[in-house]
From Swiss-Prot:
It is found in: Cell inner membrane. GO terms for biological process: ATP synthesis coupled electron transport. The gene is nuoN. Keywords: Cell inner membrane, Cell membrane, Membrane, NAD, Quinone, Translocase, Transmembrane, Transmembrane helix, Transport, Ubiquinone. GO terms for molecular function: NADH dehydrogenase (ubiquinone) activity; NADH:ubiquinone reductase (non-electrogenic) activity; quinone binding. This is NADH-quinone oxidoreductase subunit N.
């Protein structure tokens, strides 16, 4: 036997790797152009921060904004360049309408975060330029999570995002609470990564492939292959549930949200959550079996229902607004995952877009208000309307949208999602519909408390007494754009228009 005959090792598939050319061509590279721009830009920023050791790293800040804008444009270019659902890198990468919109969400949220954060870093005396490269690397991981069609690639991309977030949360090294939040998130995040890796191993054991479509095919087969695939998928979904912060895998969320710098919290609540939910959505669009009354509908459905109830009940008693938004994000994740369990795609995507903008806007205002106090609570914002009426109006618009009050975008996002659930006749979807409507009504209480505190309280809060910081250009721009999207901009992206616009851009021949 020839020991150098690689064909005797079919399990490792080394012969194919060695004998076939794996050099990517230009179309392959262009298919991941947004990720390439972000990754290359992150490395360039690290080099730039060494060359220009200015105290406030102004050059690094502006160059990072330029790179994010280039990445945003690269998403459109990639969509025009590869119309329709295209596969690249031997099926490892897929450019689709879904990945197009998700990538726009991630990069938009990163741009908003980069605009908000400079003055926050200055106020906390954080003089580390690494913040901006880490932001780019985390966003790069999100884009690869969305376009990746191989479990190994998806896992590596998810870990790239997670590791960057661990560091970003602990950026305020002098704050012990921030370090505690980092440790909790890191330990539980590592635990969830173990679940995902074990799930991938079982999926590979049942199918012999790590390609997502191929690995899920044994779900329809009886015997050990089907059982391996089922165990693997359950473990993988469990790991993703940690990242989404679904109940009961949510324990890291309140402390991580409160301990991190507020712009980082906003980025986690929007881009990172959208990336994890987007991964689950893509996974469920590739299931080779119907969802009606199946185990794969009940599993995320139960997690979604428990998340709605738990998140809203715990948010009721929170005084700190960041912790309240943390529990609120658990509830909102429940609403979105309820749609995924019902096989709904377009309404889930619309909900993610609207939620991202209203959440980012709320955190942008909290970041601004924190300049007058250590923590923003219900008591510290009392009588805010008397001192800063525009700020009080803006923050209440975002909270009313999060609560689902018409005519704001959050109301329509919930309405479209609940309408789709109502059209289904399955028991699980009916339960989720009742749970969603009931919990939305429950959420009104703690969101309306903000309006009462800011406009109707006779007491004067700490922020009303001490806050004298001027509006920054970055925060003002982000808040105004988010207000526009939440108030009227959502109309352009309603379900029916959303995928149609995506298909229109993907089918355009302007760059071909």
């Amino acid at each position: 036997m020839n020991l150098f005959d690689l064909s005797i090792l079919p399990f490792l598939n080394l012969a194919q790797v060695v004998n076939e050319s794996r050099v990517p061509n230009v179309p392959d590279l262009l298919s991941v152009l947004p990720a390439l721009v972000l990754a290359t830009g992150g490395v360039f920023l690290i080099c730039l921060s060494v060359l220009f050791k200015t105290k406030e790293f102004i050059i690094v800040r502006y160059v990072s904004g330029l790179i994010l804008l280039l990445a945003f444009a690269a998403v459109f270019y990639t969509s025009f360049r590869f119309p329709g659902n295209g596969f690249h890198f031997s099926g490892q990468i897929e450019n689709s309408v879904l990945s197009f919109w998700l990538n726009l969400i991630y990069i938009s949220m990163a741009i908003g975060t980069a605009a908000i954060v400079p003055r926050i870093l200055k106020n906390h005396k954080i003089e580390f330029p690494e913040f901006y490269p880490l932001l780019l690397f985390a966003t790069c991981g999100m884009t690869l999570m969305t376009t990746g069609q191989d479990f190994i690639l998806v896992f590596v991309a998810l870990e790239l995002m997670s590791i960057c977030l661990y560091i970003l949360i602990g950026m305020a090294r002098s704050d012990l609470f921030s370090l505690e939040a980092t440790l909790k998130y890191f330990l539980l995040g590592s635990f969830s990564s173990g679940f995902m890796l074990m799930g991938i191993a079982f999926l590979f054991g049942g199918s012999g492939s790590t390609n997502i479509t191929e690995a899920l095919k044994p779900l329809t087969i009886a015997g050990y292959q089907g059982n391996f695939a089922k165990i693997g998928l359950v473990l993988f979904i469990t790991g993703v549930a940690f990242k989404i912060a679904l109940f009961p895998y949510h324990a890291w969320t309140p402390d991580a949200y409160e301990g991190a710098l507020t712009p980082v919290t906003g980025y986690m609540s929007t881009a990172a959550k959208a990336a994890s939910i987007g991964l689950l959505l893509i996974l469920y669009t590739k299931l080779p079996l119907p969802l009606e009354n199946s185990t794969w509908a009940w599993l995320p459905g139960i997690l979604a229902l428990c998340s709605m109830i738990y998140g809203n009940l715990l948010a009721l008693k929170q005084e700190n607004l960041k912790r309240m938004l943390a529990y609120s994000s658990i509830a909102h994740a429940g609403y979105v995952v309820a749609g995924i369990s019902a096989g709904i795609k377009e309404e889930v995507l619309f909900y993610l877009i609207v939620y991202s903008f209203m959440s980012l806007g709320a955190f942008a205002i909290l970041a601004y208000l924190e300049e007058g106090t250590r923590q923003v609570t219900f008591f510290s914002v009392q009588s805010l309307s008397g001192v800063k009426p525009l700020t009080a109006i803006a923050i209440n618009i975002f909270f009313m949208s999060l609560a689902g009050v018409p005519p704001f975008g959050g109301f329509w996002a919930k309405l479209f999602l609940f309408q789709k659930l109502a059209e289904s006749e399955t028991l699980m979807n009916r339960i989720l519909l009742i749970g969603g409507v009931t919990n939305s009504a429950l959420a009104l209480y703690y969101y309306l408390r903000i309006g009462i505190a800011t406009f109707m309280s006779s007491d004067e809060g700490e922020i009303s007494r001490n806050h004298a910081a001027p509006y920054s250009v970055g925060v003002t721009g982000v808040v105004l754009f988010c207000l526009l999207m939440v108030s009227v901009g959502w109309f352009l992206l309603v379900p029916g228009n959303l995928l149609a616009l995506g298909e229109l851009w993907l089918s355009s021949s302007i760059f071909r």
